[in-house]
Amino acid sequence: MDYNLPIPLEGLKETPPTAFLTKTYNIVEDSSTNNIVSWSRDNNSFIVWEPETFALICLPRCFKHNNFSSFVRQLNTYGFKKIDTERWEFANEHFLKGERHLLKNIKRRKTSSQTQTQSLEGEIHELRRDRMALEVELVRLRRKQESVKTYLHLMEEKLKVTEVKQEMMMNFLLKKIKKPSFLQSLRKRNLQGIKNREQKQEVISSHGVEDNGKFVKAEPEEYGDDIDDQCGGVFDYGDELHIASMEHQGQGEDEIEMDSEGIWKGFVLSEEEMCDLVEHFI
């Protein structure tokens, strides 16, 4: 008796697609999440529109994790390629809408231990290089910090010296202005300076002559020395105070020593400023 036995389906002999591919296909096919992930317009790729939401909602349902980067790495191992630089769009020639049976043609890439070792060595090399760069930068910043500390210390020392000089100057002035003879000497020199300026103006005016309606200025060589002898100008404030203080009696040795230390160095006043100073104290 002959029996017509059924012929086994050819598909039963083939290896089914992996669980990862099947689950990924199901996620993309789910129309309820099209706003998160869906097929592209040409149905030959899929797009993850909202990666964060995809990781929080879709991945835990099928893969029991919410790591989007891990999902992308898995796609790479199955030959998927990211085809758009501005969005998360992936494609594989056998991953097509309505063609689930083609999933069996997608194979996982076999990675040898040597390839993995080389990859790890490359990562280790990059980490070491980054570490060396950080160490160099750290040394540079520390040196800069020390330089700034040194600069600040020098500025503090200069400030202290300036404050001491100012205090010594004020103490010296307070002692001097209490003595009438000192102020009289300053007034006398101030009046002499005013007189010198007036004489200078007279000398300049007297040497100008009218020549055919034009004012002719005399050459400075003819009487430049006389003008210099009669003119005042800018003088060192410390020298004036020193001279004035020496002109009256009763100056102590400590005051002379204070003046000789150079506390007046850098304090320069014009005759007009000296006049204002004298008028202020008198």
From Swiss-Prot:
The record's DNA-binding region positions are 17-111
Q: Which GO terms describe its cellular component?
A: nucleus
The entry lists its GO molecular-function terms as:
DNA-binding transcription factor activity; sequence-specific DNA binding
Q: How is it modified after translation?
A: Exhibits temperature-dependent phosphorylation.
Per UniProt, the keywords (alphabetical) are: Activator, DNA-binding, Nucleus, Phosphoprotein, Stress response, Transcription, Transcription regulation
Short sequence motif named Bipartite nuclear localization signal, residue ranges: 175-190
Please name one Pfam family that this protein belongs to.
HSF_DNA-bind
Q: Where is this region: Hydrophobic repeat HR-A/B?
A: 111-177
Q: Where is it localised?
A: Nucleus
**Domain of life per record:** Eukaryota
- Recorded family membership: Belongs to the HSF family. Class A subfamily.
Briefly, what is this protein's role? Transcriptional activator that specifically binds DNA sequence 5'-AGAAnnTTCT-3' known as heat shock promoter elements (HSE).
Q: What is this protein called?
A: Heat stress transcription factor A-6a
